[in-house]
């Protein structure tokens, strides 16, 4: 390897330097404090686990995004976490085993073998919150409200939210008796809004079901879409009509809490179809080609850990949040330059200053006073009349 290559990082892997790293850390603390104020408890999950545990209950997408290695001690295959959500679901279902609702939050680096999009980071800092143990729309409204409060805290401008419900397509597909292969093909066509393919794949189905499945291509837009969907899907199974009712309930409650939030509905949006079971949502901003925060309901995942629990939650990339947010992050500025001196009284003074939250940087042997400014110090400790005093840094 050439010397120059030793400094190269893999595509999508970044290092974060000062002062950006400090901004990210301050934002992390602020967001976790926000989550705590809503009753969410912080958990820390392992960076690496046995693969069967890491991927339990997850879809193929997560498998493809997971870096895999062999554990030299056990010989078993392990994976670096690519998504913290399934790990937190396991904590709720298998470790905590609470009977009532449980609110958990997390923040940590994840690693992606494949990026989410062409220019996406493969080492995002995933931040999120999950609510377990309640299947009502109230839980969905709560986590969506918390997600929006997080974006308000970061002062991310011009956000709009997309809402969908995977139960609509799932209910229609089950009623049509689609095979697994056809269901997957139809799913792919709906994501691309490929109406010709959708028509071809639904030929031979009962006319009413074919029409309803085809309608999902263009059932998208503002809140009026829900009324249109009620008419066009009037003959759908009860589960589909209940899903529409849930979407309407959630939209009404969000409009009360966030009257200026633009809501967009897409009933053919099946983000996380093999993972989510109910409402799905995502936040977008102009100029960014993918969602900046996303989530939904995933009631079935706990069953893979021996205890099915209703669940809903969201996640975001903290680095993206800091990049897009306009909130002023207050970073420590200035500091006190401590001379290279072994005096006990100086050490006691420095300890007191640091305990008060002051930043004190010690000079190393041979360092000139000019080095103090390079260390962002604007004051210095000087001994006067036998006492160590904090004075402005000499020019």
Swiss-Prot record:
Q: Outline what the protein does.
A: Required for the first step of histidine biosynthesis. May allow the feedback regulation of ATP phosphoribosyltransferase activity by histidine.
Q: Which UniProt keywords apply?
A: Amino-acid biosynthesis, Cytoplasm, Histidine biosynthesis
Which family would the database say this protein is a member of? Belongs to the class-II aminoacyl-tRNA synthetase family. HisZ subfamily.
User: One GO CC annotation, please?
Assistant: cytoplasm
Q: Which NCBIfam families match?
A: hisZ_biosyn_reg, PRK12292.1-1, PRK12292.1-4, PRK12421.1
Question: Which range is the signal sequence, renumbered to this chain?
Answer: none
User: For this chain's UniProt record, which GO biological process terms are given?
Assistant: L-histidine biosynthetic process
A Pfam match:
tRNA-synt_His
* InterPro entries noted in UniProt: aa-tRNA-synth_II/BPL/LPL, HisRS-like_core, HisRS/HisZ, HisZ
Q: What start-end ranges are recorded for coiled-coil regions in this protein?
A: none
Pathway as given in its UniProt record? Amino-acid biosynthesis; L-histidine biosynthesis; L-histidine from 5-phospho-alpha-D-ribose 1-diphosphate: step 1/9
Protein name stated in the entry: ATP phosphoribosyltransferase regulatory subunit
Taxonomic lineage = Bacteria, Pseudomonadati, Pseudomonadota, Gammaproteobacteria, Pseudomonadales
List the subcellular locations. Answer: Cytoplasm
Asked if the Swiss-Prot or TrEMBL record annotates the protein with the keyword Repeat, the reply is: no
The note filed under miscellaneous reads: This function is generally fulfilled by the C-terminal part of HisG, which is missing in some bacteria such as this one.
Q: Subunit comment for this entry?
A: Heteromultimer composed of HisG and HisZ subunits.
